[in-house]
Structures are given as structure tokens and as C-alpha cells.
Amino acid sequence: MGEKDQLRPKVNVSSYIHFMLNFRNKFKEQQPNTYLGFKEFSRKCSEKWRSISKHEKAKYEALAELDKARYQQEMMNYIGKRRKRRKRDPKAPRKPPSSFLLFSRDHYAMLKQENPDWTVVQVAKAAGKMWSTTDEAEKKPYEQKAALMRAKYFEEQEAYRNQCQGRKGNFLESAKTSLKQ
């Protein structure tokens, strides 16, 4: 595997992680000879997290915000390698939408028209509820269309892979012939 960059800033942690680290230290101080497995400790920690007041949680949220600001500042000054997203080949076929997405596309405009002040998230949640309450007979056309699109995608994907392998083969053959000359 690749080597880790030792100079890369340490990633910021959430308020819950700050709480968990603090809880762990207090637990070790109070019961130094007691060992809890990860599962049991996590369970106790999450129970405690749910039971603490909003005021106490605010302390940890403030710590998380400070940590986030620290991380962002350090990343601005960081010169080393940054993680790069793998670039998608624009010629590669796109994955087809699911039956639910096809349903959502058809009903989005109607939901937005009925509720113009809703956000995209609210419309998506409403579409999800509509989908879950829709009977199988109404879902069937969307599922059939999705299946057709999926089959077409697999065909295109296979053709694309063959084309890519052909390009690699042609490249190797042209390289060999140029070396012979």
C-alpha cells in the first residue's frame, strides 16, 4: 500500500468523538483496572451521549468547531500531496437511474408546484413517501423502464470495455512496430 504522508494535518473530529475521548479518559481515571471491549464501551458512551444536556453537548460542539477551523487553516498551509478524485472518462456510459429515480423525475414538478416553498430535500422526502405508498401495479412501468435502461447500460458498458481493451492492444502493437523500424 502507499505510504502515509506524516506531515499531512490531522483530520478534524466530530463533537461526539471529542466527547468519547473525554469519556474514555474519565472512565480510565475512575476505574483504572476495568477493561471494557470496544462494543461495550461504545454502547456505554452512546447512552451517556444521549443522556447529557444540550448545554454539555454545546461544549463538545464548540471543540469540534475549533478543531474544524484548525484543520482548515492547516490544510490551507499544507503543501504536500492532496487526495485526488479519480477522473471519470466522459466517454464511459453513465449508470442508469433506478425505478425510484424515474418515478421521482415524473413527480418532482407536480410536488414542487403544489409546494413551491419546499427545498429539494423536502421534495425528495415527499417523493420517497409517495413511492413507498404506491402499489406494485403503479411501480411496474418504472421498474420495467429501469430494467430496460439497465440492460442497455450493461451492453454499452461491455462495448466500452471492449473498445478500451482494443485501444490498449492497438497502442501496444503500434509501439512494437515502431520499435522494429
From Swiss-Prot:
Protein family: Belongs to the HMGB family.
Domain of life according to the entry: Eukaryota
One GO location term (cellular component): nucleus
Region (Disordered): 80-100
Protein source organism: Mus musculus
Descriptive protein name: High mobility group protein B4
Bias type Basic residues, positions: 80-89
Pfam families: HMG_box, HMG_box_2
Keyword DNA-binding in annotation: yes
Compartments it resides in: Nucleus; Chromosome
Tissue: Expressed in adult germ cells (at protein level).
Xref: PROSITE patterns: HMG_BOX_2
One GO MF term: DNA binding
Keywords on record: Chromosome, DNA-binding, Nucleus, Repeat
DNA-binding region: 9-79, 93-161
Claim: Repeat is one of the keywords in the record: yes
SUPFAM superfamilies: HMG-box
